C-alpha cells in the first residue's frame, strides 16, 4: 500500500511505464526513488529534473517494509540482485498494476483501453479535463503527472498479459478490439474475453466505438454508450469538415447537438477519439465550452503523428505497427499533405506479428507511393523467427529494404511526406535520415 511516510522504491525505474508512475507519485507528494541498469536512457531525464534519485541495481538499496514500499517492474525476476534481496530479507513488493489501481481508487477515474488509439485518446482526455479541473494522468508514451487534490485520474489501460484487469475504474473508453499480442493471447476469443472482464470491472459507464462488433457484443450491468459516425450511435460526430489544418465537426449526444468542436489533428480516427472524450466529459457534466477550448490547444501525443518540416520534405514519426493503425496514419498523412508524394518507412514489430499480418502489411504498403521496410524489430520475448523484411518487400512492387547503411537512399524522395512507423527502435532510422537533411 502506498504510504507518504515511507520511501516508494522502484525496481526498474527507467522503464517507460515505471518512470511515468514514479513521476506521478512524486507529484502527488510521495518520497520516490529507484534503480535500474546503468545504461543512460531518455526516461531518466524528467526523473532527475525533479530530484528523483536514480541508482544502479544494488542489494543494499533494499531495506525493509517498515521503511519502503517496493514497486517491482514486470521484467525483473529472481536473478535481479534487488529482487533476490527482497526474497532473502522477506521484503514484499507490489506490481505496477497494483500501484496504479491504488491511484484509480483515489479519484474519479477513466481508463482508456483498446488495441489502437489508447495513447492518443488518453493524451487528449487528460489535456481537456486538465483545463477544467485538477487532473492526474498516466500515459503509455512515458508521460505521467500527478496533481495534489486532483479530481480526475486518466490512465492508459494495457491489455497485454491482461494487465488492465488490475483496475476498477469509474469509466472506461474502449476504442476497438482487433486481435493483437499473438505471443500471449491464444486467439480472438481469448483476446476479446480480456475486454469483457475489463468491462465487468468498470463501475459507472462504458464508452465503445459503435462500429466494432466485438465491443457491441460485450455484456454489462452499467450503461454502455456507443460513439461514432452512425445515426444509431449515442454520441455521433456529424457535419464533418476536414482540411490541411485539422477537422471541425458537431457532436450529437443522444440526439442533442452539443455544438461544433475543432481539433488540429488528422484522420477519422482522431475525430472518433475526440468524440469518445466528449462523451465522457458530457456524462461527467463537464461544461462543453471548456472541452471546446481544450480541444483547440491540444497538440497531439508523443510519437503519434509527430511532424517535422525540412523544406520540401515533411517527416512524420508514428508508433503505428498494426494494420489498423497504419491505415489510420496513412489516411491522416494524405489529409495533411494532399499534394506530396507519400513515402513510408516501416519497421515490422516482432516476428509473430509480422507473420500474422504479412498480407495486410503488403496490401497497405502497395498503396503508398514508395515503401521501405527495415529489418524486423525483435522483442526480448522473441529473438528470431522464420520471416524477414525481404519476404515482405518481394510482394510490394518498387519497395526496398532499408537499414542504417543505406538510409541516404531516402533523400531521393523530393516533395515528399516521409512517414516513419513502428513500435521498436525506428527513431534511430529517422534520426540518421534527418542528419542528412
UniProtKB/Swiss-Prot annotation:
Which InterPro entries does the UniProt entry name for this protein? Answer: Mur-like_cat_sf, Mur_ligase_C, Mur_ligase_C_dom_sf, Mur_ligase_cen, Mur_ligase_N, MurCDEF_pg_biosynth, UDP-N-AcMur_Ala_ligase_MurC
Root EC class: ligase
Instruction: Extract one GO molecular function annotation from the record.
Output: UDP-N-acetylmuramate-L-alanine ligase activity
Annotated Gene Ontology cellular components are: cytoplasm
Q: Which reaction does it catalyse?
A: UDP-N-acetyl-alpha-D-muramate + L-alanine + ATP = UDP-N-acetyl-alpha-D-muramoyl-L-alanine + ADP + phosphate + H(+)
Primary residence: cytoplasm
The entry marks the following residues as binding ATP, namely 114-120
Compartment list: Cytoplasm
Which Enzyme Commission numbers does its entry carry? 6.3.2.8
A Gene Ontology annotation in the biological process aspect, one of them, is: peptidoglycan biosynthetic process
Pathway listed: Cell wall biogenesis; peptidoglycan biosynthesis
What are the protein's UniProt keywords? Answer: ATP-binding, Cell cycle, Cell division, Cell shape, Cell wall biogenesis/degradation, Cytoplasm, Ligase, Nucleotide-binding, Peptidoglycan synthesis
Q: Which domain of life is it from?
A: Bacteria
Xref: PANTHER family: UDP-N-ACETYLMURAMATE--L-ALANINE LIGASE, UDP-N-ACETYLMURAMATE--L-ALANINE LIGASE-RELATED
Describe the function of this protein. Cell wall formation.
* Family classification: Belongs to the MurCDEF family.
What name appears for this protein in its UniProt entry?
Answer: UDP-N-acetylmuramate--L-alanine ligase
- Organism from which the protein derives: Lactobacillus helveticus (strain DPC 4571)
Q: Which gene encodes it?
A: murC
